[in-house]
Amino acid sequence: ALGVQEAAWLFGHSDGASIALLMATRWPQRVQGLVVMAPHLFVEDVTVQNIERAREAYEQTDLRHKLGRYHDDVDSAFWGWNRIWLDPAFRTWNIEPEVAQIRAPVLAIQGCDDEYGTLAQIRGIAQRVPGTRLLELPDCAHSPHRDQPDAVVAAAVAFIQAHHTPA
């Protein structure tokens, strides 16, 4: 509908980063490169523990109100996310085999203090996708774009400039 023919650069955070990685495996001709922040390749105990804490915060604090600034249907957004991650059947979710198919350049960014995943997530990308550049940010939690915006923007701009191929 938009008439966009050029392969796109995908920039995703958290579950959105995982979706970007999956798009690059399914439609490689549509993806020129990826910048992923705090992606999930597999489920870790720390992820589940902190998503349980998020549920408690949603029920007992003003988290629902805060999230309402970003979501029209905050309950649907929160509970859809929370329930899938806490479903015991989801514990086996793993996209590592799919990620190994990626051939586009990848910049993978993770906060060293990420409460929803360890550095094993982005290191797993580097083990599977040749040429992946890692940016592990100290004093940074799950939202590098919020916690260290200057570092994220500088790294992303430099990476895209180094790998962008004009149409």
Where are these regions (language model features)?
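Conserved hydrolase catalytic core segment
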Residues: E6-E44
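A short beta-to-alpha transition loop/helix N-cap that caps and shapes the active-site region
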Residues: H40-I51, Y116
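Catalytic active-site module of serine/aspartate enzymes centered on a nucleophile-bearing elbow/loop
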Residues: T132-R133, P138-A167
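A catalytic-pocket lid/entrance helix-loop region that shapes and gates access to the active site
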Residues: T47-D72
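Conserved alpha/beta-hydrolase "acid-adjacent" motif
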Residues: E115-Q121
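Active-site nucleophile elbow and catalytic-triad environment of alpha/beta-hydrolase enzymes
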Residues: W81-E98
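Short beta-strand/loop motif that positions the catalytic acidic residue
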Residues: I102, A108-Q110, D114
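Alpha/beta-hydrolase active-site loop
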Residues: A1
